[in-house]
């Protein structure tokens, strides 16, 4: 037979308190199976304790002690001392709670001692010098006859007393205990674990109910990122639909107003005049649709085609007089339409009214014609579209036409005003340039600043003119 290993012998000795020879004997009896040998040892101890306690006919097992005196300790013979039954359930509880898998744990003995101390039902008074009477284990002869003592049992008591500083507290106490007191087992621990699991389940269910209640009362309080994006998309779609409805409504109002206004008129602003043939609009010019303007806004605009824009007109010609209304009042009515609908009536005038209107502002037109070449010559060279510092400025005029040109970020704002004045559509000094979002207005006083200083650094910037009152 293979002899037990040294580790198994040391483990058996440290757990049971037996001697080395007894540990070797027990391990050999159980085929070097350490857990079985230890379990057999504690079963023998438990059987011996129950057999010995059943022979005792006395009813008073308990030890009644106080701080300085133990009753009957002087008159009772040493060999009549009996173990205090209060300590036995603790040992039995430790034996029943033993798990072989814990043998490798260095804190195993400490855990056993904690279980023993936790199973004690009463507090421990100060230790007494009468060890035979107080601790329940006789000082000279613990079990009387040696043949009735199980092998290694005496070493068990000594081992526990030696290894456990709280051993005395497990057998001391002023509470009277019987041999029939209940023995603690793992049932209490299982009940505590089961109660903790049930409490955890209950908390989880309450948390789900609270979350569902909060969602029912305030669904917007906990929205996922996808739901937030969907709501934003719905808001954008709603805003676009409202914008389209307003545009249709304005179109209907324009049609109703067109019934009371001339069918063919040339727009002329009192603050602007132009006699240049390239910017004079004749009847029969083609209509420019809004979608074409939007397409042109996304593309770089050639300066040669920036000055060509068509206005909407109808087949009929504008008569010379409308119920005695002079041309000046008619022009004011056209400007009123612009103020109401945010734009200017895109209609061309008849040849007769063109002559009448341009006669009133012939002198300013001549001055603008003379200044146009000078302003065009003062403009810097237009950079190419591949230049990283180039920006395209698209300006919407009051007549809904768009003019654009490329500049460098280092160019001054004055060049933009020169470019607009060179177009001859508005009178210099009567307007300002506005960026819609974030809204910011630029006047001629800002002409010394560069586009980069004015935060006009995007590849394409959309601006519009705002006439000064």
UniProtKB/Swiss-Prot annotation:
Residues 4-43 form the UBA-like domain. Keywords: Phosphoprotein, Repeat, Ubl conjugation pathway. Residues 368-377 have a biased composition (Basic and acidic residues). Residues 188-207, 231-250 form the UIM domain. Residues 386-464 form the UBX domain. Residues 119-129 have a biased composition (Low complexity). InterPro entries: UBA-like_sf (IPR009060), Ubiquitin-like_domsf (IPR029071), UBX_dom (IPR001012), UBX_domain-protein (IPR050730), UIM_dom (IPR003903). The modification Phosphoserine is found at residues 181, 224. Residues 271-289 have a biased composition (Polar residues). Residues 119-188, 264-324, 355-383 are annotated as: Disordered. This is Plant UBX domain-containing protein 9. It comes from Arabidopsis thaliana.
């Amino acid at each position: 037979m293979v002899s037990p290993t040294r580790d198994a012998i040391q483990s058996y000795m440290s757990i049971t308190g037996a001697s080395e020879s007894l540990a070797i004997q027990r391990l050999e009896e159980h085929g070097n199976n350490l857990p079985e040998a230890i379990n057999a040892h504690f079963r023998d101890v438990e059987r011996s304790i129950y057999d010995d306690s059943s022979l005792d006919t006395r009813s008073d097992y308990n030890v009644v002690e106080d701080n300085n005196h133990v009753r009957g300790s002087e008159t009772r013979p040493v060999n009549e001392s009996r173990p205090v039954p209060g300590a036995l359930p603790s040992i039995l509880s430790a034996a029943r709670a033993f798990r072989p898998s814990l043998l490798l744990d260095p804190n195993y003995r400490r855990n056993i001692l904690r279980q023993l101390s936790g199973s004690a039902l009463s507090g421990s008074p100060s230790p007494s010098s009468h060890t035979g009477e107080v601790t329940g284990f006789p000082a000279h002869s613990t079990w009387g006859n040696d043949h009735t003592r199980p092998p290694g049992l005496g070493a068990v008591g000594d081992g526990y007393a030696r290894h456990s500083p709280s051993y005395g507290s497990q057998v001391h106490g002023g509470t009277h205990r019987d041999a029939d007191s209940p023995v603690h087992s793992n049932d209490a621990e299982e009940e505590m674990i089961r109660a903790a699991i049930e409490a955890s389940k209950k908390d989880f269910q309450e948390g789900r109910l609270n979350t569902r209640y909060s969602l029912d009362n305030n669904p917007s309080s906990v929205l996922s990122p996808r739901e937030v994006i969907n709501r934003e998309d719905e808001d954008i779609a709603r805003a676009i639909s409202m914008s389209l409805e307003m545009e249709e409504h304005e179109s209907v109002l324009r049609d109703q107003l067109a019934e009371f206004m001339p069918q063919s008129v040339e727009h002329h602003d009192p603050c602007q005049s132009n006699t240049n043939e390239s910017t004079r609009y004749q009847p029969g010019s083609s209509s420019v649709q809004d979608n074409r303007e939007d397409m042109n806004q996304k593309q770089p605009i050639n300066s040669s085609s920036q000055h060509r824009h068509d206005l909407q007109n109808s087949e009929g010609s504008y008569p010379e007089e409308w119920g005695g209304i002079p041309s000046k009042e008619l022009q004011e009515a056209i400007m009123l339409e612009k103020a109401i609908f945010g734009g200017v009536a895109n209609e061309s005038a008849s040849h007769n009214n063109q002559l009448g209107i341009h006669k009133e502002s012939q002198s300013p037109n001549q001055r603008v014609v003379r200044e146009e070449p000078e302003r065009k010559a003062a403009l810097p060279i237009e950079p190419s579209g591949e230049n990283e510092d180039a920006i395209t400025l698209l300006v919407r005029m009051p007549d809904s036409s768009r003019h654009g040109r490329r500049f460098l970020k280092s160019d001054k704002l004055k060049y933009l005003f020169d470019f607009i004045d060179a177009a001859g559509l508005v009178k210099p000094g009567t307007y300002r340039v506005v960026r819609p979002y974030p809204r910011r207005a630029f006047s001629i006083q800002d002409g010394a600043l560069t586009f980069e200083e004015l935060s006009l650094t995007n590849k394409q910037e959309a601006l519009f003119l705002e006439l000064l009152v």
